[in-house]
Structures are given as C-alpha cells and as structure tokens.
UniProtKB/Swiss-Prot annotation:
Domain of life of the source: Bacteria
Encoding gene (name): rpmC
Name of the protein in question: Large ribosomal subunit protein uL29
Matches recorded under SUPFAM superfamilies: Ribosomal protein L29 (L29p) (SSF46561)
GO MF assignments: structural constituent of ribosome
Annotated Gene3D superfamilies: 1.10.287.310
Organism this protein belongs to: Acetivibrio thermocellus (strain ATCC 27405 / DSM 1237 / JCM 9322 / NBRC 103400 / NCIMB 10682 / NRRL B-4536 / VPI 7372)
C-alpha cells in the first residue's frame, strides 16, 4: 500500500487496517518458522505497510488532525 493511499483513509480505517496487517504478520511469521511460507518477501511487504500506517498515524497525532 502506498503512503499516498494511506493518507486518504480515515483514522478508524487505518486502525482497522493496522490490526489486520498485524494478524497477517503473525500468521506469516508462523508459516516462515515452520518452513511453509512460499514467498518470504511477503513478510517484508507487510512489515513495511505496518510501518507506513504507523508513520501516518503518528504524523496526524503530532498535528492534532483526525481525518
């Protein structure tokens, strides 16, 4: 997910997306540990998406904006 798309979403949508991505990351880590993960790059992509969402949420917190 691109940062531009993330910035268009509301606070609640971002919180929901963050929870979903964290759950997906948990599943992927478990699959990776048991050697069932076909594409290890998926781990990196999910981690980066989580970081992007957290960054946007923090920016909004500092600005005091709730879009």
């Amino acid at each position: 997910m691109k940062a531009k798309d993330i910035r268009k979403k509301s606070q609640e949508e971002l919180q929901k997306e963050l929870v979903e991505l964290k759950a997906e990351l948990f599943k992927l880590r478990f699959q990776h540990a048991t050697n069932q993960l076909e594409n290890p790059m998926k781990l990196r992509d999910v981690k980066k998406s989580i970081a992007r969402i957290k960054t946007v949420l923090r920016e909004r917190e500092l600005k005091g904006i709730e879009v």
